[in-house]
């Protein structure tokens, strides 16, 4: 099966069902990173991922890694840490700094080149891409960013420069996201870090069904306003975090070998 070459004159993508099995999820190549094309991709469960300086590649892997916010796994040590958390958290205060940090903090190299950073900063300016920042006093020590598609948040990357900074960021984001009606976080591809936090793999067709419904459930505008976030963990020494419920899915075929978050 051949990979589709995208037209520069159209934002139409091929069906995700046409994606390759190896490499898992490769669907199309070419095109550009303009805001209309990126939005068209995310609305169809497709995302860009490529090495800086090379041709743009578009992916829709099967299975798909997702995190249901209520299933976020919080270890005992993290529970203790968050009770006395030294950080403060903000939303959409320093998007460009967060994506730049995500690009520079990767020892194994990064897919977040300058063109990607500029493209997502444009999405942020248009109100579609968002960041959560973690501060220690006045220093940015952690954060994450991604793209909102209705009640789905497509997580792109996160970084940490201090103990538990990225984990704290995800905890605070999940709380804020669900408080405003968010239902699903797209992690795209599974890795050890996201799996340890509760991300799971589900069949692509199930993910696309969820996306097709939830993208038409926009969250209230105040969800994404620049703001400081205060997180009150739902636990104490005598009241643990709730136990995640178990979800069952059809059998999964194939495993991902890609790493992203």
Swiss-Prot record:
Coiled coil: none
InterPro entries: Acyl_CoA_acyltransferase (IPR016181), Leu/Phe-tRNA_Trfase (IPR004616), Leu/Phe-tRNA_Trfase_C (IPR042203), Leu/Phe-tRNA_Trfase_N (IPR042221)
Molecular function in Gene Ontology: leucyl-tRNA--protein transferase activity
Enzyme Commission identifier(s): 2.3.2.6
UniProt keyword Transferase, yes or no: yes
Domain of life: Bacteria
Swiss-Prot/TrEMBL keywords: Acyltransferase, Cytoplasm, Transferase
Enzymatic reactions: N-terminal L-lysyl-[protein] + L-leucyl-tRNA(Leu) = N-terminal L-leucyl-L-lysyl-[protein] + tRNA(Leu) + H(+); N-terminal L-arginyl-[protein] + L-leucyl-tRNA(Leu) = N-terminal L-leucyl-L-arginyl-[protein] + tRNA(Leu) + H(+); L-phenylalanyl-tRNA(Phe) + an N-terminal L-alpha-aminoacyl-[protein] = an N-terminal L-phenylalanyl-L-alpha-aminoacyl-[protein] + tRNA(Phe)
HAMAP family attached to this UniProt entry: Leu_Phe_trans (MF_00688)
Protein name (database record): Leucyl/phenylalanyl-tRNA--protein transferase
Lineage: Bacteria, Pseudomonadati, Pseudomonadota, Gammaproteobacteria, Enterobacterales
């Amino acid at each position: 099966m051949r990979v589709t070459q995208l037209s520069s004159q159209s934002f139409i993508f091929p069906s995700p069902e046409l994606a390759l099995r190896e490499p898992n999820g490769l669907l199309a190549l070419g095109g550009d990173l303009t805001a209309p094309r990126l939005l068209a991709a995310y609305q169809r469960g497709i995302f860009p991922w490529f090495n800086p300086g090379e041709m743009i590649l578009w992916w829709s892997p099967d299975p798909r890694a997702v995190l249901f916010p209520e299933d976020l796994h919080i270890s005992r040590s993290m529970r203790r840490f968050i009770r006395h958390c030294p950080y403060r958290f903000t939303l959409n205060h320093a998007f460009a700094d967060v994506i730049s940090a995500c690009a520079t903090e990767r020892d194994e190299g990064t897919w977040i080149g300058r063109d990607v950073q500029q493209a997502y900063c444009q999405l942020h300016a248009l109100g579609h891409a968002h960041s959560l920042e973690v501060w220690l006093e006045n220093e940015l020590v952690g954060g994450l960013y991604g793209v909102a598609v209705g009640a789905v948040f497509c997580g792109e990357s996160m970084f940490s420069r201090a103990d538990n900074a990225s984990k704290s960021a995800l905890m605070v984001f999940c709380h804020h996201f669900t408080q405003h009606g968010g239902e699903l976080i797209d992690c795209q591809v599974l890795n050890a870090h996201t799996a340890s936090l509760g991300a799971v793999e589900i069949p692509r067709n199930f993910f696309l069904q969820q996306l097709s419904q939830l993208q038409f459930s926009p969250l209230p505008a105040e969800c994404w306003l620049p703001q400081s976030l205060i997180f009150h963990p739902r636990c104490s020494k005598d009241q643990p975090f709730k136990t995640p419920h178990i979800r069952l899915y059809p059998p999964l075929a194939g495993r991902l070998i890609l790493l992203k978050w």
